[in-house]
Curated annotation (Swiss-Prot):
Taxonomy, superkingdom: Eukaryota
The organism of origin for this protein: Candida albicans (strain SC5314 / ATCC MYA-2876) (Yeast)
Name of this protein: ATP synthase protein 8
Annotated keywords: ATP synthesis, CF(0), Hydrogen ion transport, Ion transport, Membrane, Mitochondrion, Transmembrane, Transmembrane helix, Transport
Family assignment from sequence similarity: Belongs to the ATPase protein 8 family.
Transmembrane stretches, start-end: 12-32
GO cellular component: mitochondrial membrane; proton-transporting ATP synthase complex
Membrane topology, record value: Single-pass membrane protein
Subunit record text: F-type ATPases have 2 components, CF(1) - the catalytic core - and CF(0) - the membrane proton channel.
One function term, GO molecular function aspect: proton-transporting ATP synthase activity, rotational mechanism
Job of this protein: Mitochondrial membrane ATP synthase (F(1)F(0) ATP synthase or Complex V) produces ATP from ADP in the presence of a proton gradient across the membrane which is generated by electron transport complexes of the respiratory chain. F-type ATPases consist of two structural domains, F(1) - containing the extramembraneous catalytic core and F(0) - containing the membrane proton channel, linked together by a central stalk and a peripheral stalk. During catalysis, ATP synthesis in the catalytic domain of F(1) is coupled via a rotary mechanism of the central stalk subunits to proton translocation.
Keyword Ion transport: yes
Length: 48
């Protein structure tokens, strides 16, 4: 199990931080604005 070998901790930590950072950036710049645009469009359609 590589999680228990201290040599791999830095690699796992770096990979984990990089993956979380990339996912957070993508969700904040691409996914969330599209969802917000869709919800606003639906709200406008329902009101009309």
């Amino acid at each position: 199990m590589p999680q228990l070998v201290p040599f791999y901790w830095m690699n796992l930590l770096t990979t984990g931080i990089a993956a979380v950072s990339i996912l957070l950036y993508l969700s904040a710049t691409i996914i969330l604005p599209n969802v917000l645009r869709l919800l606003v469009a639906r709200a406008i359609i329902v009101r009309v």
